Design a protein with these regions (language model features):
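N-terminal export signals
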Residues: 3-25
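Flexible C-terminal active-site loop/helix
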Residues: 8-11, 28-45, 61, 69, ...
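Metal- or metallocofactor-binding catalytic centers and their adjacent structured scaffolds
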Residues: 30-38, 54, 67, 72-140
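Short Pro/Gly-enriched beta-strand edge/turn motifs at strand-loop
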Residues: 42-50, 233
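Conserved, mostly hydrophobic/aromatic
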Residues: 64, 70, 129, 142, ...
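Metal-dependent enolase-superfamily TIM-barrel catalytic cores that perform enediolate-based chemistry
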Residues: 145-256
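Structural recognition of alpha->loop->beta junctions
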Residues: 225-237, 276-282, 326-347
Length: 374
């Protein structure tokens, strides 16, 4: 990692503690528990969402609110079934975490470590608690989250809009609807991938990125498809093969014409050293790694291994996307469109304009909701 990059990432970790040292001591007095509420919320997708491993019309997320002194901090969990998570398991984990949240949340790093140690998994609900705590702290300080992290909102990369697997005419129509986005992400990993990309190319000449979601099972197949896609204007491919095929990824890395980005092959910063030799970059997701703090650590470790960094998302509301967007000045590529895929976003205040998520100077995440009426 270059000295400049190290200092930038170090600044992210130092920013919160410096603010605490500089502010009036009484601001940080902690003498009572938070009110904590979490509820399942069904997200209705605008279009059926199909990947190489399934189709969904509805996703069940968990919305979290912590409240104290008239200030609400919001968080969101988008459970990942691949890792054994569900909305119900997230609620059960949150009950285990309640005693930790009765402690001083100004010591938010300690609280996150204690929450993380409660169980190996449940990263999505850990992310919800992490973002809710930081949203509350930032609102108390009257600071937007990106400034609390020491990051410049002017460095946010453009986000892709994802096109799920569908009949080619429907995918072409989704491309037309994405006219404001400079780069598109196309889901692949099927027997019809060539026809899909050729069909997309009939209606746009924009740069493309593809995501196979582990859909290609042989390295020779992956190599052939990736190098063919390179000639079709595809910039990089995410997770072409199953995560367990690490030696095949090492073989593939030396032979492909465009970068291969790891997604399902890793979850947290500790996973990066073991997979770095097989990839050109990584995809960080708050729901996969456990929250904002771990995402920042992952970006730092990835840079140390000279890897490109992408920030992705699940199907989420504007709360989850706002949290990820605050971290996005640290990364090279962004795929933060989860809120644009749903028809019933309960949060307001976040905009995506000409393919960029717009961070405001409102405190915390910068989003509001009428989901809680009190």
């Amino acid at each position: 990692m270059k000295r400049k990059e190290f200092l930038e990432v170090s600044g992210v970790f130092l920013a919160g503690s410096m603010l605490r040292d500089a502010a009036a001591p009484e601001l940080f007095t902690w003498n009572g528990a938070l009110d904590i509420d979490a509820r399942i919320y069904e997200l209705r997708l605008k279009h059926a969402w199909t990947l190489s491993r399934g189709t969904w019309n509805v996703r069940r997320n968990v919305l979290v609110r912590i409240r104290r002194e008239g200030i609400s901090g919001y968080g969101e969990s988008a459970p990942i079934p691949r890792y054994g998570e569900s909305a119900e398991s997230g609620l059960a984990f949150l009950e285990k975490a309640r005693p930790i949240l009765e402690k001083d949340i100004w010591a938010y790093r300690d609280r996150w470590r204690e929450i993380d140690a409660l169980a190996e998994g449940e990263h999505a609900v850990k992310a919800a608690l992490d973002m809710a705590i930081l949203d509350w702290i930032c609102k108390k300080l009257r600071l937007p989250l990106h400034l609390f992290l020491g990051l410049d909102k002017g460095r946010i990369p453009a986000t892709t809009l994802s096109i799920g697997i569908d009949a080619i005419p429907e995918m072409q129509e989704r491309v037309r609807e994405a006219a404001d986005f400079p780069v598109l992400k196309i889901k692949v990993g099927t027997k019809d991938d060539r026809a899909i990309i050729e069909g997309i190319r009939k209606v746009t000449d924009k740069p493309l990125r593809t995501d196979a979601n582990e859909g290609w099972k042989r390295r020779e197949e992956a190599l052939e498809m990736i190098n063919w896609m390179a000639g079709m204007g595809v910039e990089f491919v995410e997770q072409p093969m199953p995560a367990a095929m690490i030696e095949d990824y090492v073989w593939l890395k030396d032979r492909v014409k465009i970068p291969v980005i790891a997604d399902e092959s890793l979850m947290k910063a500790a996973d990066i050293p073991s997979i770095a030799r097989g990839f050109h970059g990584i995809n960080i997701k708050l729901m996969k790694c456990g929250g904002i703090q771990e995402a920042v650590r992952m970006a730092a470790v990835a840079r140390a291994f000279d890897l490109k960094v992408m920030l992705g998302c699940m199907v989420e509301t504007s709360a989850g996307i706002a949290a990820a967007a605050a971290v996005s000045p640290l990364v090279d590529y962004a795929d933060l469109d989860g809120n644009l895929l749903i028809a019933n976003d309960p949060f307001t205040g976040l905009q995506t304009i000409r393919g960029k998520v717009v961070l405001t100077d409102k405190p915390g995440l910068g989003v509001e909701t009428g989901f809680w009426r009190d």
